[in-house]
Swiss-Prot record:
The keyword Cell cycle does not apply. This is Imidazole glycerol phosphate synthase subunit HisF. It catalyses: 5-[(5-phospho-1-deoxy-D-ribulos-1-ylimino)methylamino]-1-(5-phospho-beta-D-ribosyl)imidazole-4-carboxamide + L-glutamine = D-erythro-1-(imidazol-4-yl)glycerol 3-phosphate + 5-amino-1-(5-phospho-beta-D-ribosyl)imidazole-4-carboxamide + L-glutamate + H(+). Belongs to the HisA/HisF family. Its main location: cytoplasm. Keywords: Amino-acid biosynthesis, Cytoplasm, Histidine biosynthesis, Lyase. The active site is at residues 11, 130. GO terms for molecular function: imidazoleglycerol-phosphate synthase activity; lyase activity. It is found in: Cytoplasm. Heterodimer of HisH and HisF. Pfam families: His_biosynth. Signal peptide: none annotated. IGPS catalyzes the conversion of PRFAR and glutamine to IGP, AICAR and glutamate. The HisF subunit catalyzes the cyclization activity that produces IGP and AICAR from PRFAR using the ammonia provided by the HisH subunit. It comes from Oceanobacillus iheyensis (strain DSM 14371 / CIP 107618 / JCM 11309 / KCTC 3954 / HTE831).
Length: 254
């Protein structure tokens, strides 16, 4: 059995790490390079960097910040936001990312997933899905930083993304984002059941029990932001707890 992964997320706006609730009420948190170094040293399994306004502002990603972060860490590094072409993907990978997360552009042109997988490999191509419940047991895909409802069913989109060559899926539960009431298990487990590639749960972590709850299912990794940023949960302590709960996670290196 593969070890489950613990993944801190840096939501970056204008070169600073920020955090909000349900994709709104954005507050400044910290310098991304310093935070990245801290998570690398604490034993995070991976790091995610989202330029959260790039897509909505129709601009490219902050490659200079990506480069600075990449130089300071020795763990897998996923980058997303404002990625619309294979040229963008090439630039992000060249800047030090190991994986690229595609969201809005994939919805607008699904062929981008296929092109990325063919050119750079499925292991580099991650489909990120911002999903919101619009009826009981039905979730739609939202784009442009969660601002626009596409009307596309999230579970069907995950299956389509896999068929196009995505090697992994991040499920961002918009209703749970920043609420700290737990991950959206119905949504995330439904997607994990529907596909045969790794699924990362995102949105809602508030305590260590929430990590146990989500990783007890067929979900490969748990992504979180504010609980790590504000030292509410320490990664070494979280990993110790999960191992005690018989959930396989990589041992802390420090």
């Amino acid at each position: 059995m593969l070890a489950k992964r613990i993944i801190p997320c840096l939501d970056v706006d204008n070169g600073r790490v920020v955090k909000g609730k349900k994709f709104l009420d954005i507050q400044d948190v910290a310098d991304p390079v310093e935070l990245a170094k801290r998570y690398n040293d604490e034993g995070a399994d991976e790091l995610v960097f989202y330029d959260i306004t790039a897509s909505n502002e129709q601009r490219g990603i902050f490659l200079d910040v990506v480069e600075k972060v990449a130089k300071e860490i020795a763990i897998p590094f996923m980058v997303g936001g404002g990625i619309r072409t294979t040229k963008d993907i090439h630039q992000v990978l060249r800047s030090g990312a190991d994986k690229v997360s595609i969201n809005s552009a994939a919805v607008q042109r699904p062929e981008l997933i296929f092109e990325s997988a063919q050119k750079f490999g499925s292991q580099c191509t991650v489909l990120s899905i911002d999903a919101k419940e619009i009826a009981v047991g039905k979730w739609n895909v939202f784009i442009n930083g969660g601002r626009k409802d596409t009307g596309i069913d999230a579970i069907e989109w995950a299956k389509k993304g896999e068929s196009y060559g995505a090697g992994e899926i991040v499920v961002n539960a918009m209703d749970a984002d920043g609420e700290k009431n737990g991950y959206n298990l119905p949504l995330t487990t439904a997607i994990a059941t529907a596909v045969n590639i790794p699924v990362i749960a995102s949105g809602g972590a508030g305590n260590i029990q929430h990590f146990k709850d989500v990783l007890s299912h067929e979900i490969d990794a748990a992504l979180a932001a504010s609980v790590f940023h504000y030292d509410e949960i320490k990664i070494p302590a979280l990993k110790t707890y999960l191992n005690e709960q018989e959930i396989s996670v990589r041992r802390n290196s420090k």
